[in-house]
Amino acid sequence: YKLICYYTSWSQYREGDGSCFPDAIDPFLCTHVIYSFANISNNEIDTWEWNDVTLYDTLNTLKNRNPKLKTLLSVGGWNFGPERFSAIASKTQSRRTFIKSVPPFLRTHGFDGLDLAWLYPGRRDKRHLTTLVKEMKAEFIREAQAGTEQLLLSAAVSAGKIAIDRGYDIAQISRHLDFISLLTYDFHGAWRQTVGHHSPLFAGNEDASSRFSNADYAVSYMLRLGAPANKLVMGIPTFGRSFTLASSKTDVGAPVSGPGVPGRFTKEKGILAYYEICDFLHGATTHRFRDQQVPYATKGNQWVAYDDQESVKNKARYLKNRQLAGAMVWALDLDDFRGTFCGQNLTFPLTSAVKDVLAEV
């Protein structure tokens, strides 16, 4: 099974023990590590951070210790406007320029492939995304004729039914991609007026709106649309989503007044790294959604949906049962990468739990 792990370059800026550089990554933990994110400037792939080139090198040095490790560079992301992708992909010339710029950039910096993180293509972008994927793959095939190992091509795809229907020709893009990472962890956020889990494995009985909003539905839907199981990778989060409660109610459907308070290290409302959640759990009340098979915790007026070792192991068992290609983890730097927060003296407790299940016969 593949275990595809994202690393985010901005995690270097978190203070103190939250700061994560690629040398913190265990080279044997994942089969693939994806560096997020690269930029596009003048229609060519480019660095984003001032020190990206140094960090690329630090990451790719991990392959000295584990020569089997593959690394990919992800282009795009949430802060990269989807309309910028549209502009490049919709015109033959700019698309050509972008595609041509990719192999030399990846080779120069020691990457094994490219991950497309166009979040998210709109209705008009559907055929342009297909063309981009098809032409990028053709370029990778052409480039490998020189005798080098062919570059890998993957894509991160929304797990929401509406977004899938709108932006992706799944059957077509699947033919040209080496794997597809399904972002099965953004099903519920602080934009909702009530509490709910962002990464349930199955639908909840209580919640009519959750019929489509769970990993099981998304996986089944993708397979039905023509994604081959052996190319489909299921996303598992190492972060939680937090809410500020608007009343004393804490169960399903409890009203919220907004996102939860920012974490000490990640400093973003409504989101917490697993290592911050381990801190939060001291003195908190924990619960589990039996049907959705994911935990949540409350303390004061804060309500946090998250994943723990039990829930990620369940998800790993599920994807093995569905005979998928493997699991994807977002992100290594949000797991307890130092092993100092979650009390087991174990680095990357969630990612390791997934790895353990994938390794079981």
From Swiss-Prot:
**Keyword Secreted (UniProt):** yes
List of residues binding chitin: 49-50, 76-79, 120, 183-186, 241, 330
Q: Which UniProt keywords apply?
A: Antimicrobial, Apoptosis, Cytoplasm, Disulfide bond, Endoplasmic reticulum, Glycoprotein, Inflammatory response, Lectin, Secreted
Q: Biological process (GO) annotations?
A: activation of NF-kappaB-inducing kinase activity; apoptotic process; carbohydrate metabolic process; cellular response to tumor necrosis factor; chitin catabolic process; inflammatory response; lung development; positive regulation of angiogenesis
State a GO cellular component annotated for this protein.
endoplasmic reticulum
One GO molecular-function annotation for this sequence? chitin binding
So which residues have sugars stuck on them?
39, 345
* Taxonomy, superkingdom: Eukaryota
Functionally, this protein is described as follows: Carbohydrate-binding lectin with a preference for chitin. Has no chitinase activity. May play a role in tissue remodeling and in the capacity of cells to respond to and cope with changes in their environment. Plays a role in T-helper cell type 2 (Th2) inflammatory response and IL-13-induced inflammation, regulating allergen sensitization, inflammatory cell apoptosis, dendritic cell accumulation and M2 macrophage differentiation. Facilitates invasion of pathogenic enteric bacteria into colonic mucosa and lymphoid organs.
Q: Which family does it belong to?
A: Belongs to the glycosyl hydrolase 18 family.
The UniProt subunit note reads as follows:
Monomer.
Q: What is this protein called?
A: Chitinase-3-like protein 1
Whichever gene encodes this chain, its name is: CHI3L1
